[in-house]
Every structure is written in C-alpha cells, then in structure tokens.
C-alpha cells in the first residue's frame, strides 16, 4: 500500500513519486491550498494539495485529525524560506496527486494541543501510542532488546524459555495464582522470576543462559513498578562474581553507546556498608556531590540528649550533611525539610548555618549551638569541610532511620538546589550486602533471596553467626536507580538447607516447597551465578522518562488495573464452577 515511510523522506527523494500511508497529524486550510502534516511510526512529513488536482483538494477539505489516509504524490524540495529545521523532513514536502480516506475518526477523546491526564491516556492507549514521543520510546525499547540478543548471542549465551505456569515459592512478594481445572483445588503461580529454573538449567549443563522474560509480582505499586514486568535474565556456570559483573557491565556500556552515544566508562565498585555510610542508600545517585559525614564521636559528651543518646548507642548514628550554598535557605524551607525527614521516621532536623567561619560562634546561626561549645562546632565544620555560605543538616537516631532520612534528604536537596548534575551518567556496582536482615518479628529474612551464597563462610560458620554473613551479591545502580541485581548462588545442599533453616523453613516445608531443588543439588551441581536487569527500568533511563508506564505499550495503573480493557474483571460463574472456585463476599461490619 505504500512505497516509503513519511518520516524517512529526504532531499534524496526529490522528484520521486511516493505512496504514503498514515494519519493526519494536523490540517491547515488556506482555501486554494490545503496543507497536512502526515504521520506514521517513523515521523511526520508535510503534504499539500493544490487546485491543479481538484479531486484530491476537494477530498482533502474533509480531512480531520487522526483520519487514516493514503496519499500518492511527488517529493519536492522546499523553498529556502519555508525549510523547517525542527523537522527531520523539513527540507522537503509532498505534492499530492491522489488521496484515499481509509478510515475516518470520531471526535478525539485526547487533545494533542493540551496535556492529557494519565487516566485518559491509559484508557485510550491506542491513541496515546500514536504520539511521536511514545512511538519513539517503544522503538527504543525494541532496539534495546535487539542489541541485548545480539550481544548475548555473540558471548555464547543461549536463549532458553522457562515455564510461565509454575509452583509458588517464597520470593518476597505475593504470587499471582492460576487455578487448575484438571487438578481440583490446586493452583499454579505465575513466576516472580525464573530464578530456580535458570539455576536448574545450570545444573543441566547449559553454562550460559539468558531470556527476555515476563515476571509477575502482586505488590503495592509505585512509579517504577508494575504487576507484570520484563527482565533480561542471565545465569552462568563456572564464573566468579567479578567475571559476571565484567560481562554484564560490558552489555550495559554497549547499550548506552548504541542508544545514547555515551561511553559510561568503567563502573566503580562500592560495598553496601560504604554506600550506606556515605550516601544513606544502597543505590546512591553519584551525580549528587553531597555526602554524609559521621560526627557521633564529637558529640558523645554534649548535654543535648538528641545528639548524645544516639552518639553513645552502638545501634545509633549521628550524621551531618553539608549543603554547599545552603545558608541561603529560608526558615520556611528548613521547616519543610524538617517535615520531609519525618516521613522516614526522623523526629526533626537540626542544622548549622555557616555565615562566616572566621568569626567562630558569631559566624554561625543554629538552634543547637547553645548545646555545643566552640571547639565542637569547629571540629564539625572541619570534618565536613564547611565553607562560608554552607548549611549543615544533622540526623540523629538509630542507624536505619538516619540512613533513610538523610539519604532521602540528600536527594531532595540536591534536586531542589540544582546540585545534582542531571546531564551526567553515574553508574556503579554495589557489593557485599548483608546476607540477612531483621524481619521485625525476632527472626531473619533474606536480603536478596534464599538461594544467594554467603561470602567466604562454611555452612557451620553461617549457622553459628548468620547476622555476620555477607552475601556474595551485587547490584548495578545508574543515577540512583537499581537497574539490575544478582548473586553467586548456593550450589551445595548442606548450605542451602542451612539457609532455609536460618529463615525458619523447617525440613518438612523445605521438601514440600523446594524438594526438586534439593534433589538436583545432589548430582554434581556446578558453581553458578547470575543477574537480572529490569528491561522496563533500563528503557526508562535510556528514553529520559521518570515513569515506567511510558515505556510499556499497555501498562497497568498503580491499582494494577488496565483502564482500556477494564481488567481485572469478574469471571464467568460457569468458568468458576469448572475450577471448583466459589467467590465469598466478606461480611460487612456494622
């Protein structure tokens, strides 16, 4: 039906007759001439109709936005004064000789001249996806997956599919369950990841596996989460953690070079402990120059319980955040930041405004200065490298609250004051995570998943001191986003059962849920390690959007609903009966 794409016409096509198919993006009626911007997935070109082709001109007068049309015409160079430098096709136009209206469009529910609500965009997603910026994001996503496949193929990885209908296993979030019609009362689970299957593939001798795969998690959503999402899933045998990181880093550098024309360079490597200490986060945004500075040792003897309490508590922390130029902040802004850190459990926000260091106590402004002597204040200013015009904020509480609150404050202040360099890319690896964390009920939970191997520990050593265990795990972080994470896996049955035991999974439950894995570990399992990238999040970064729904063709809302198809919906009673399922309404409380 067509010979060329609208957006691919250039000066080299001048004089050629072309046939185009697409949509009316805009129409301008000048009476004797009608101009339209005609759009397809590759872009927009200007088409005009003149009186010499009366039939085409007459039909063009009926055109409205989003009519689907076919145009045949001749490509012409525009006059110098009419060249549009903002369009890729701005040096040419098409003089139409014939026009076919393939399909007309009703009054549009989306307005291309205004910002539409996200609700409207999701309800009429097929119209939203016609917008050039949305089409470009999905084209970039397609390019990314193509680049990934070629890279992985070139590095000896095999693309192997794993099951979608599988067994529910604890991986940190709720499963989406699928009832079995054949096996009454039993359910499949949609996979949260192919974790165990890819490990089993390593046990099967496949050495290097990858898959671009859908995963499902029934969890509370936010801007960068979806109930169904896509992973670039990778597993290897006989490779160490640094070797896995080297290959995966090369993949991501390749993507940035091909998509953005940017060489990310070598990724720095930072331990979890260092990231938490310096940035208050295990996914630090290194574009932000500010760091947390520990000052507890300077405040142990002060007569100010807010500082002295955490300073003398082994589980406490007092950290300072120097904000360059922050002395210009108003009292209202400071109060707003004080309220902001309360979201993360902090009780408030102490501060020192550094107006003129040379004047000592007279050169600062602080509500806590009366509790601190001149020597302590000078030591704090020295340690934080404070200069005239700076602000120092303090967090004092248990270690987690201080890290969470001050880490979040660092990001917010960096953005508010323009201290974060938005033009940069700042990748890094974070390694050496704690193996376990407190589950809040006196037990332990796996910080990553229960198949992660500890670093340099035997099963006996792990059982004796699980709280000291360091996971042989690694996360890739870019600009404050965790884009991928992985680990060396447990390849020994005794170690795997030890980890299960630490997590409170008794032997009977181990057999019930993981018997197939424990059996497989008996038969010469190779050492193996892997990683998974979030394709949606990678695409989000590479296309410059801050909303993951912008890079998924048909995403769900934050309520896990599809506004277009109205999914989820009530099931047919007959279908439920075949599955032996009965929907029971909860009794309402009076």
Swiss-Prot record:
* Subunit and partners: Homodimer.
What's in the keyword line of the UniProt record? Aminoacyl-tRNA synthetase, ATP-binding, Cytoplasm, Ligase, Nucleotide-binding, Protein biosynthesis
Q: Could you state one GO biological process linked to this protein?
A: aspartyl-tRNA aminoacylation
Source species: Escherichia coli (strain K12)
> Family, per the entry?
Belongs to the class-II aminoacyl-tRNA synthetase family. Type 1 subfamily.
- The molecule here is called Aspartate--tRNA ligase
Binding residue positions for ATP:
217-219, 226, 482, 534-537
- Residues at which L-aspartate binds: 171, 217, 448, 489
NCBIfam families (alphabetical): aspS_bact (TIGR00459), PRK00476.1 (NF001750)
**Function, as annotated:** Catalyzes the attachment of L-aspartate to tRNA(Asp) in a two-step reaction: L-aspartate is first activated by ATP to form Asp-AMP and then transferred to the acceptor end of tRNA(Asp). Also mischarges tRNA(Asp) with D-aspartate, although it is a poor substrate.
The disulfide bonds in this chain are none
Name the Gene Ontology molecular function terms of this record: aspartate-tRNA ligase activity; ATP binding; nucleic acid binding
